[in-house]
Amino acid sequence: MEELHAEHQYLSQVKHILNCGNFKHDRTGVGTLSVFGMQSRYSLEKDFPLLTTKRVFWRGVVEELLWFIRGSTDSKELAASGVHIWDANGSRSYLDKLGLFDREEGDLGPVYGFQWRHFGAEYQGLKHNYGGEGVDQLKQIINTIHTNPTDRRMLMCAWNVLDVPKMALPPCHVLSQFYVCDGKLSCQLYQRSADMGLGVPFNIASYSLLTCMIAHVTDLVPGEFIHTLGDAHVYVNHVDALTEQLTRTPRPFPTLKFARKVASIDDFKANDIILENYNPYPSIKMPMAV
């Protein structure tokens, strides 16, 4: 019996939300169909779970993840690499709408990268040198994999209650846990808020890539990515686009390799990360709710 393509998990989740989701008003004013609590699992051993039923912005996945790893909170730094997915949240008008009038344009506050690399440090703007401040959760996980791989405390948390009011956008993907078994590294992500149309395909790829990168620098092989969703939702203005996507049959996933041996997570460059045999359907335009 032929094994079902892993992408069908995502498509089935979308279909279930469209058929059974509860209509909810939301902070963006767009409105969503929503289901609470979903999970999917993607093997990272032979191929890489970049969805094929629409083209996913792979370069954006890579550049954003490297930006997180650098601990950056500057949307203009990401934009300089040609990736503009955070521009709206760092705009002057958006920051003013949040009451962050003194915040420099592009300064997103203590968002993902800051929490990953400087958890607990006092946020003092994007130009401050945070070297040695706070807890470097990412480095701590890598060190623990080396020294105590059976540890059950390999967690990286982006949700810092004290810092949430200072963030242009509180984290949607809030908690990841890493797990080593039989020489394989796996990751489970808890995502409190899951935009099925735009965010989730990106998040699957991003945390799968992070898992592969950490496995590479710790001399393990990638195992599995498990994606647990809290509020899984479809924006009402994405319904038609996702209905079209559901008509498409998944194609084989691409494969991932690294161009060289990289010793430290901080040493990865975009051209070290090579995606091969990605043959998706055309992209489907969906507006971003801000």
From Swiss-Prot:
Keyword Cell wall biogenesis/degradation assigned: no
Any single Pfam family the record assigns to this protein: Thymidylat_synt
Gene: TS
Chain positions recorded as (6R)-5,10-methylene-5,6,7,8-tetrahydrofolate binding sites: D195, A289
Name assigned to this protein: Thymidylate synthase
Active site positions, chain numbering: C172
HAMAP family reported for this sequence: Thymidy_synth_bact
Binding site for dUMP: R27, R152, R153, R192, S193, A194, D195, N203, H233, V234, Y235
Record-listed E.C. numbers: 2.1.1.45
Assigned keywords, A-Z: Methyltransferase, Nucleotide biosynthesis, Transferase
Catalytic activity: dUMP + (6R)-5,10-methylene-5,6,7,8-tetrahydrofolate = 7,8-dihydrofolate + dTMP
